[in-house]
Amino acid sequence: MRDADRIQSEILKIINDDPTIQGASHIFVSVEKKGVWPRTKEVVVLKGSVHESSDSTKAEKIAALHAAGREVINSIAVH
């Protein structure tokens, strides 16, 4: 398993297992390339939607803790 795949799976599992995040099943995690070669880097991207901004913040904090130094981009919509 690629390191990026492992990180993606780990972050998604931790978010889904967190009982304090309502609607965790509506949060999606990906590890994407950002930038132009030869200066590309991997970033962790959070997408989806939640009802409370605190859920988006919690997911972002979890991702940052497990991103292995990668930047986290939080694109979770709050409705």
Protein language model features and the residues they cover:
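N-terminal targeting leaders
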Residues: 1-79
